[in-house]
Amino acid sequence: MKTKIITRRDFLRVAAVSPVAGAIASYQNKSSSKDIAKQPVSQAGTGKIRVVLIRDENALAGFKKPNEEVVDRMLDEAMASLFDVSDPVQAWKDIVGPTDIVGVKSNVWRYLPTTREIEGIIKKRILDAGVSEESVGVDDRGVRRDPLFQKATAIINVRPGRTHDWSGIGGCIKNPIMFSPSPPDYHPDSCADLATLWDHHNLRDRVKLNILLMLSPQFHSTGPHSY
C-alpha cells in the first residue's frame, strides 16, 4: 500500500474534525520506521516526525468517558502502524524495556483529564513490554517532586487536546510544562518560548512517545480556566 504523506497543516485540519480520534507520534532520522525508537528526540532536528492518526466512532462509552476495550484496540493498532510491526507489544518493546524506569506524564485538569482508563491502558502495555510494576509511574503536577520521574529513563507524554487561553492550544508540546520550577515563565508573548522547555530536564532524550487524545477535545474558551 502506498504511503500517504501529510503535512502538519493536513494533520491539524483532520484532527480538528475528528472528535473520536487520537494521534501518536515518535521521531526518526532514518527511512525505516523500525529505527524510530533508536532516535532520541534530541537527534530529530532535521529528521522526520512520524505521526499516526486513528479514529473509531465507538471510542467513547459516554460523555468524556473512554470505551476501554475500543481505545485499547486503537492504541494497539496505532502503535503497530507507527513502528511498522504486527505485534503492538513489540512496538512498546522498541521504546521501553526491563531496565527502564518509565514515567507517564498525564494531565489531570478536572474538566478534561487524560482519564484513569487511558492511563491504565498505557501502563498495561508498558508492563507487557517487560518494565516492572515498581518502575512505572503516572503523574502530572507532581512530576518535579516524584522520585520515579526524577530517575525516569523514558517518558510517555499523553494528554487531551484543547484550546488554551495563553498558548492557543494545549497539546503535547505544552504538557511537560510541570517539569519547570516556574511554569509561568513560559506564558509571556502567547507562550512563544514554550518549545524551549524541551531543551531542559533532559526531555528531548527521555520522551519516547507523544499521544494526543482527541476523544472529546475543547475547541473554544473565553479565559485561562474556562470550559
Pin down the residues of each PLM region:
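N-terminal and secondary-structure boundary signal
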Residues: M1-Y227
